[in-house]
Structure formats: structure tokens, C-alpha cells
Swiss-Prot record:
EC number: 2.1.1.45
Name of encoding gene: thyA
PROSITE patterns linked: THYMIDYLATE_SYNTHASE
Active site: C146
MF term (GO), any: thymidylate synthase activity
Protein's name in the database: Thymidylate synthase
Stated role: Catalyzes the reductive methylation of 2'-deoxyuridine-5'-monophosphate (dUMP) to 2'-deoxythymidine-5'-monophosphate (dTMP) while utilizing 5,10-methylenetetrahydrofolate (mTHF) as the methyl donor and reductant in the reaction, yielding dihydrofolate (DHF) as a by-product. This enzymatic reaction provides an intracellular de novo source of dTMP, an essential precursor for DNA biosynthesis.
This protein's pathway: Pyrimidine metabolism; dTTP biosynthesis
Reaction(s) catalysed by this chain's protein: dUMP + (6R)-5,10-methylene-5,6,7,8-tetrahydrofolate = 7,8-dihydrofolate + dTMP
Localisation: Cytoplasm
């Protein structure tokens, strides 16, 4: 995961200091891209330990189209609690937009199901796009989508994915996002009888929060270890029926976790 460490170094070397919505302040750059060949291993950073269960459960929650933290809590995950209301609701965030994008006639579009059908039937289409950032719904969301749009690309029997992340918390968020969309690419590839290709991460406002500068510098002192691999133990009837126990990360070795505060 050297591209990730190179991004941290780039922000420390060239980033500009800016105020932000949370009041924490950031060092940021605008526009950056990283590429990961999924055939070479699963892109989990190894320079600090990640909470793999939280990453995988969150993606399965998105795929279910849910917006209440109950499913997360039922599986021991609390990463969305800071934004949920007293009933556990978060508004029309990722899962809602992926599975129930509102239409002008009052109906809904299941973007994920439609994209899956397109990949199967028209793999070379340039329209394999799913959008989470719905401007008409932003004010109703507890947190507007940071990872805003993603696109799939099929070539030579391999499925690749590119994510555009409008706002990128490099220390806490980006490692989760890379792993989450890499997993999504693997799942869709399995459902469509394809191999995996690349995951391409593209960021807009790419930043380190002020209180993450020292933890980020600590990561830079650690030499990356070999990447683990993903094992999918079952192929369910649909993309929306995977369970956590269907997934296994093999040979994940990492340095210890590095604690850092989240900015809400």
C-alpha cells in the first residue's frame, strides 16, 4: 500500500492549511488518484490494523439499502453512531440512494440492481455508474456522501471500479473506503462471472485533519507488509444476500492500530 503512504507524504509536503465544517481544521490537496491491482492482493493497509468487520458489515448494510444503525448494532458495529438520531436514523444516505433513488413520478430506481444487469448484458457499456450524492436529498442526510460516485469497467473478462470521493479523510476514512469498494468489486465480479481488475480511487478534497498529523507521521515510519487476500466462501443467489460469514481475509498481517479522534 505504498500509494497510500505516498499520499500522506504528499499532503504533509504540499498541503495547504484550511478551516473546515467540523472546526478541527485540515491540511489538504485538491485532486489525487491511486490505483490498486486487485489481482495482486486485497488492498487493506498494513501500517496500522484496520477493523475489518466494520468495513465488511458497513458495505453489506449499504447493499441492503438500509439507513438505520440497528443492522450495524446487531453485528457489533458502531461507526455511524455519532451521526444517527435518537431512533438510529441517518436519513437518505448511501444505501437509500444506491437501492431507492427517488424518481420524479414518485417511484424509485434500484441503481445497484440496474448496474448489475447492465454489466451482465452489456459489459462494455460506459454507463455502469452508481451515484450516492443526490443534491435534492442532501439536507435530509445526517452526513452527505463523501464517496459520491463510482463506475465499473469491463475489459478482457476483468471488472474494474473507479470511485470518486468528494471529501477524503485520509487517516481514518480512506483506508476503509479503499477496502469497501475493493470488496464490492469482488462481489460484483463473482455475481457476473468475471475476474477482478483494478480499483481506482480518485479524491477531490483530500485532507488530513490537524489532530491526525502526528498519527499520520507515525504511519510513515512503518514499512508496508505483504497484502492479504480475500476469500469468498459462498456465492448467494444475488448481490444483496451476502453475509459476513461468507467473507474471509487470509494472511492479514499489520502493525498495531493507531488511535485518532473522528471529526463530526
Amino acid at each position: 500500500m505504498k500509494p497510500y503512504l505516498e499520499l500522506i507524504q504528499k499532503i504533509l509536503d504540499t498541503g495547504v492549511e484550511r478551516d473546515d465544517r467540523t472546526g478541527t481544521g485540515t491540511w489538504s490537496i485538491f485532486g489525487h488518484q491511486m490505483r490498486f491491482d486487485l489481482r495482486q492482493g486485497f488492498p487493506l493497509i498494513t501500517t496500522k490494523k484496520l477493523h475489518i468487520r466494520a468495513i465488511f458489515i458497513e458495505l453489506l448494510w449499504f447493499l441492503r439499502g438500509e439507513t438505520n444503525v440497528k443492522y450495524l448494532h446487531d453485528h457489533g458495529v458502531t461507526i455511524w453512531d455519532e451521526w444517527a438520531d435518537e431512533q438510529g436514523e441517518l436519513g437518505p444516505i448511501y444505501g437509500y440512494q444506491w437501492r431507492s433513488w427517488p424518481l420524479p413520478d414518485g417511484g424509485y430506481l434500484d441503481q445497484m440492481a440496474k448496474t448489475l444487469t447492465q454489466i451482465r448484458n452489456h459489459p462494455h457499456s460506459r454507463r455502469h455508474v452508481v451515484v450516492a450524492y443526490n443534491p435534492a436529498c442532501v439536507d435530509e442526510m445526517a452526513l452527505p456522501p463523501c464517496h459520491a460516485l463510482f463506475q465499473f469497467y469491463v475489459a478482457q473478462g476483468r471488472l474494474s471500479c473507479q470511485l470518486y470521493q468528494r471529501s477524503a479523510d485520509v487517516f481514518l476514512g480512506v483506508p476503509f473506503n479503499i477496502a469497501s469498494y475493493a470488496l464490492l468489486t469482488h462481489l460484483i465480479a463473482q455475481q457476473c462471472d468475471l475476474d477482478v481488475g483494478e480499483f481506482v480511487w480518485t479524491g477531490g478534497d483530500v485532507h488530513l485533519y490537524r489532530n491526525h498529523l502526528e498519527p499520520a507521521r507515525l504511519q510513515l515510519t512503518r514499512e508496508p507488509l505483504s497484502l492479504p487476500h480475500l476469500r469468498i466462501k459462498r456465492r448467494p443467489p444475488s448481490l444483496f444476500e451476502y453475509q459476513y460469514d461468507d467473507l474471509e481475509i487470509v494472511d492479514y498481517q499489520s502493525y498495531p492500530a493507531i488511535k485518532a479522534a473522528i471529526s463530526v
